[in-house]
Each structure stands twice: as C-alpha cells, then as structure tokens.
Amino acid sequence: MSRRGTAEEKTAKSDPIYRNRLVNMLVNRILKHGKKSLAYQIIYRALKKIQQKTETNPLSVLRQAIRGVTPDIAVKSRRVGGSTHQVPIEIGSTQGKALAIRWLLAASRKRPGRNMAFKLSSELVDAAKGSGDAIRKKEETHKMAEANRAFAHFR
C-alpha cells in the first residue's frame, strides 16, 4: 500500500466572460500548441454565432447540447481467458461531460465549413436539437453497451 496520500480532485475554473465552467472545459479541450487566447477566441465566436442563429442564451444551448451528448454507459475492453470482451460500464457525470465535449469537438472538426467557430456553433446547435454527429456517436456507444450486456458481470 502506498504511503502517499491521494491527490485532491481539481475543480474546473470558470472562464472570464461567461463565468461558466463548461466554457472553460471546452476551451481547454480545443486548445492546441498552448495557444489559449486563440482557443478563447474560437469559443467566444462560436457562442456569438449561436446567439445570432437561435436568438437564445448561448450558454443554455451549450448546456443542452452537452446534456444531450453525455453518455450514461460505455464499453471497456476486458481480457478474460484468452478472449477480449467489451464490458459495459457506467460513467460518472464528470467523465461523461468530458467525453461529450471530446465528441462534440471531434464532430465539429469533421464538419465542412469556413472556420472552427462556425463548425462548432453548427454542431452545438444540432446537438441541442438532438441531431448531429456527436449525438450519433452517443447512440452508437449505447448500442454497443446494450449488445454486450451479457458481459456486464465481468466488471
């Protein structure tokens, strides 16, 4: 047993303009090569575009999109007696949000379009409405977990 104590879990800080933790999580995931100011610009432009498109609060659209994409269950590879099984496991809220943000950004990057702010805003609006690539990814994950329900006891 280790003598060192367990590390305290860091709470996500909120961003300077919207004072929201989700926005900051999104900024930290979109960040490339340490260019945080560029990441903030992209996110704020995307939120402004959402405001123009939907004429509603962009934070509520963001929350709704992330809530819609957040998975409840996922599959994890587990080796049992020479064969690898996809074992369904429940996901906590923090890990679920992190996965949702990752899927939203991946779907945004895949989209055709002018710039990342435009693509991200389109993906967030679609996800809030219940369509889009990120929602499809969540449904795919849930189907995989449902198909491998028989291996749930391998946890």
Curated annotation (Swiss-Prot):
Q: Is RNA-binding one of the keywords UniProt gives this record? A: yes
Q: List localization entries.
A: Plastid, Chloroplast
Question: Does the UniProt entry include the keyword Cytoplasm?
Answer: no
Main localization category = plastid
Q: Which Pfam families does this one have?
A: Ribosomal_S7 (PF00177)
Matching entries from SUPFAM superfamilies are given as: Ribosomal protein S7 (SSF47973)
Q: Which GO terms describe its molecular function?
A: rRNA binding; structural constituent of ribosome
Record PROSITE patterns: RIBOSOMAL_S7
State the Gene Ontology BP annotations.
translation
Keywords associated with the record: Chloroplast, Plastid, Ribonucleoprotein, Ribosomal protein, RNA-binding, rRNA-binding
Give an example GO cellular component term for this record.
chloroplast
Q: Which residues form a coiled coil?
A: none
This protein's superkingdom? Eukaryota
What is this protein for, i.e. what is its function?
Answer: One of the primary rRNA binding proteins, it binds directly to 16S rRNA where it nucleates assembly of the head domain of the 30S subunit.
Q: What is known about its subunit structure? A: Part of the 30S ribosomal subunit.
Q: Which NCBIfam families match?
A: rpsG_bact (TIGR01029)
PANTHER family under this entry? RIBOSOMAL PROTEIN S7 (PTHR11205)
HAMAP family for the chain: Ribosomal_uS7_B
Which protein family is named in the record? Belongs to the universal ribosomal protein uS7 family.
From the Swiss-Prot or TrEMBL record, give the protein name: Small ribosomal subunit protein uS7cz/uS7cy
